[in-house]
């Protein structure tokens, strides 16, 4: 099922930046917010509690990648924060991903729904050249992504983070219900920034993405609210 709200990546360095940004929106409008490493390492759980207190959904983007026991324990803690989605690196392996889900289930308070758990396949900043030269994965980028997606499904996770260009083949290799969350989304004419594999909101919708993540085209816009609504409208066409 496709989420009708673009996920806004609040890649800010300070808690105060989050407050300033969210205050621009009408309090009645409920957003889907991605909180990343820098912000969480700076502000800690309080930034999650604050965003949730305003009624917004939270994707806590920490990309856990460690030994299974450590990831399981960490997920047990993150589940208590009330977030709606968390992620791990698929490169950690099936055992680690299974442990992550187990920890998430154990930590979710009674009466609450377990946060969705997705895995990163290859970062959208990774090119095939980088993958082959630096990671020494001597297949195509697409084959690597699909392999990671299949391992993620095997582990029982809800979906993956992937480029919109890979959505159709990932769903064919897993299932239609398997979530594909796609960063690297840019409105027509926007700068690609450090993203190597990008797509517009309309293209991502057409190709079957379930969630899209948009950061700088919204957060660095002169009018972030208008920019968000324009992207949301394009996403829901």
Curated annotation (Swiss-Prot):
Positions with a binding annotation for substrate: 11, 34, 61-70, 124, 186, 195, 215-216
- Intrachain disulfide bonds: none
Pathway assignment: Pyrimidine metabolism; UMP biosynthesis via de novo pathway; UMP from orotate: step 2/2
The highest taxon in the source lineage is: Bacteria
Q: Which reaction does it catalyse?
A: orotidine 5'-phosphate + H(+) = UMP + CO2
A GO biological process held by the record = 'de novo' UMP biosynthetic process
State one molecular function term (GO). orotidine-5'-phosphate decarboxylase activity
Name of protein: Orotidine 5'-phosphate decarboxylase
Biological source species? Lactococcus lactis subsp. cremoris (strain MG1363)
């Amino acid at each position: 099922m496709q989420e009708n709200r673009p996920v806004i990546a609040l890649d800010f360095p300070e808690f105060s930046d989050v407050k300033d940004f969210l205050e621009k929106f009408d309090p009645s409008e409920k957003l889907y917010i991605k909180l990343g490493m820098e912000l969480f390492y700076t502000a800690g759980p309080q930034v999650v509690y604050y965003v949730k207190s305003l009624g917004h959904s939270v994707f806590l983007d920490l990309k856990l990648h460690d030994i299974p026991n450590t990831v399981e324990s960490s997920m047990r803690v993150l589940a208590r924060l009330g977030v709606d989605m968390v992620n791990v690196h698929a490169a950690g392996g099936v055992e680690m991903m299974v442990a992550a889900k187990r920890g998430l289930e154990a930590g979710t308070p009674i009466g609450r729904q377990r946060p969705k758990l997705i895995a990163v396949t290859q970062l959208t900043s990774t090119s095939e050249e980088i993958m082959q030269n630096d990671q020494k994965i001597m297949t195509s980028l697409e084959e690597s992504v699909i392999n990671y997606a299949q391992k993620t499904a095997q582990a029982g996770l809800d979906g993956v983070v992937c480029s919109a260009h890979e959505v159709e083949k990932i769903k064919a290799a897993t299932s239609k219900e398997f979530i594909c969350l796609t960063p690297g989304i840019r409105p027509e004419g926007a700068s690609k920034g450090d993203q190597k594999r990008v797509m517009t909101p309309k293209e991502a919708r057409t190709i079957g993405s379930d969630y899209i993540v948009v950061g700088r085209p919204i957060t660095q816009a002169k009018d972030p609210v208008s920019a968000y609504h324009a992207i949301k409208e394009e996403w829901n066409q």
